[in-house]
Amino acid sequence: MSIENKDNINKIVLAYSGGLDTSIIAKWLQDTYDAEVITFTADIGQGEEVEPARAKAEAMGIKHIHIEDLRAEFARDYVFPMFRANAIYEGEYLLGTSIARPLIAKRLVEIAKEHNADAISHGATGKGNDQVRFELGAIALAPDVKTIAPWREWDLSSRESLMAYAKEHNIPIDFAANKKKSPYSMDANLLHISYEGDILEDPYAEAEDDMWRWSVSPEQAPDTPEYLELEYEKGDIVAINGEKLEPYEVMIKLNELGGKHGIGRLDIVENRYVGMKSRGCYETPAGTIMLKAHRGMESLTLDREAAHLKDELMPRYAKIIYNGYWFSPERQMLQALIDKSQEYVTGTVRVKLYKGNVSVVGRKSPYSLFDEKIATFEDDAGAYDQKDAEGFIRLNGLRLSIEASRGRDLS
């Protein structure tokens, strides 16, 4: 909504991190809209304490403060369903930021309804994808709740102007800590941590090694490989090395192990939904292992044509999530197909972690479609008649022979 349209805005629910940007937004909303601000802080595995956000909100006179641990819901209802699809955007990006936004949008509008709030607000800039993801999610779930995006309204355009605003309005910010803060714009959750800005704005400049926070460089990783056994039930990992774990615990464990072995680093230039190209670096240790292992499990248990159909639909599914349409009929339709495909994706995958690489080295399943009697290079005892291949080839080559008989050059 535009800044001119401020009538009847009495309560606003703000997605609040406790950092510089959202602390300034909280004060700006109070002053600009003369409205009560309610804060919502989500723990989705970013690895930082979220409780300090409470003290900062209280210092600004916020009366209703929501701080919630959403790690279990995030992993169970968002990340794991997405990984059943083997979703990758533009061939590389594992959608770590994209998949976190729908849950936050969902809780924002739910809290708004609990408090009879008129609007929600977020700290996403007007250049990025997150504004789209937050707002499309809110529209899908609560079209009557308005969204306020301060970065599209105010005239604060730099970190210096934000710091000046904070000082002028006595906003509780640790200015010394902010000056020492990483030069990169970072975002983290259970699935990944992302880095943008500073030297990364030059797509030819290599990221400095001290930027990476979750993983060692592959060169510094252990010289001895580590093997893991991942147990699957209907497309989801349920245990690691025999230890039963909840989805969020699986991700914590795999992030730790993958990071130790330098797995999951990515440096890409991607096409944002809003139209521009952006360079980002990502660490996704757990996701990298999960994707490789899941494909290994599917290779044993999925029918060929079902697997190929999934592969054809995967880019569309990934694009839907990247662009912010998690709450959409097309995503629901594809999810139903994907979930059906996982009915027999059950068993164990053995992977090897070594110096930035994850390799599937074994797989087994009670629903395996691998028939050793048929596939063997030894005597198959009549399980497969090789003479049948002649008719198969003749029929599949029929159209080619007709083309050739008409004098068409197929070379």
Swiss-Prot record:
Catalytic function, reaction form: L-citrulline + L-aspartate + ATP = 2-(N(omega)-L-arginino)succinate + AMP + diphosphate + H(+)
Localization annotation: Cytoplasm
A Pfam family recorded for this sequence: Arginosuc_synth
CDD domains in the record: ASS
PANTHER family, A to Z: ARGININOSUCCINATE SYNTHASE (PTHR11587:SF2)
Family: Belongs to the argininosuccinate synthase family. Type 1 subfamily.
Name of the protein this chain belongs to: Argininosuccinate synthase
Organism: Psychrobacter sp. (strain PRwf-1)
